[in-house]
């Protein structure tokens, strides 16, 4: 099972941004940058026996590999470890259940979408998948709605569970390299995130 541990009380009504390891490490790069640039405070973690037996060290101190940060009404989840396939369902479920219990205004997952000709793309485009059409207006010109296709992995399940729980959810995916880190894709997705949230 997966549990969300709040080290201190997290106020309700936040916007939640998820950065999990994925294609081009786009989500982790983008949300880690967000956390450091906004000086977000670490307020909790996600714990599970299904996750690899590891801790990350920051300032010499052990930390959970999946941590929760907060600044004003913006919360962020960053994972510094890949999520094993056997933990994906329970992790997605725990994140959305927690967001629902906290009356989250919006759950935004950010990541990459591998494209073959990435080296020829100067500025990666950002695409969006949404839980409902009313969010299209909010997107504006920040991202192009993915009309057809499919998604796999944690973000697919988070979006589906948001839909099932009637939590507003958006997944932002930037065109990226498949097999190595893509900071330009992370920058593109951050730009879209800034337009949507006004951060």
Residue ranges and their predicted role:
Residues 81-84, 145:
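Surface-exposed cleft-lining segments at the edges of enzyme active sites
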Residues 1-81:
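N-terminal short beta-loop-beta anion/metal-coordinating cradle
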Residues 41, 96-107, 163-168, 196-199:
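Secondary-structure boundary elements
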Residues 116-196:
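Catalytic cores of processing enzymes, dominated by hydrolases/peptidases
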Residues 20-25, 83-86, 112-117, 178-180:
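Gly/Ser/Thr-rich loops at beta-strand to alpha-helix junctions
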Residues 85, 89-135:
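Internal, conserved structured core segments that host functional sites
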Residues 18, 77-78, 109-111, 173-175:
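Short beta-strand segments
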Residues 32-36, 92-95, 187-190:
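Short, solvent-exposed amphipathic alpha-helical segments in soluble enzyme
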């Amino acid at each position: 099972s997966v549990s969300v541990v709040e080290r201190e009380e997290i106020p309700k009504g936040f916007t939640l941004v998820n950065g999990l390891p994925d294609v081009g490490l786009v989500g982790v790069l983008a949300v880690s940058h967000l956390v450091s640039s906004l000086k977000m405070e670490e307020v909790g973690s996600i714990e599970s026996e299904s996750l690899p037996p590891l801790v990350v060290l920051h300032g010499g101190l052990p930390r959970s590999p999946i941590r929760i940060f907060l600044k004003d009404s913006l919360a962020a989840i960053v994972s510094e470890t890949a999520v094993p396939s056997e933990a994906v369902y329970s992790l997605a479920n725990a994140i959305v259940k927690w967001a629902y219990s906290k009356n989250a205004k919006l759950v935004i997952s950010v990541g990459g979408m591998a494209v073959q000709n990435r080296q020829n793309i100067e500025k990666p485009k950002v695409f969006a998948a949404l839980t409902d059409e009313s969010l299209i207006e909010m997107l504006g010109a920040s991202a192009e709605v993915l009309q057809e296709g499919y998604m796999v992995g944690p973000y697919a399940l988070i979006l589906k569970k948001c839909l099932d729980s009637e939590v507003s959810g958006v997944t932002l995916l930037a065109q990226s390299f498949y097999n190595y880190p893509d900071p330009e894709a992370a920058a593109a997705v951050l730009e879209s995130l800034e337009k949507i949230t006004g951060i």
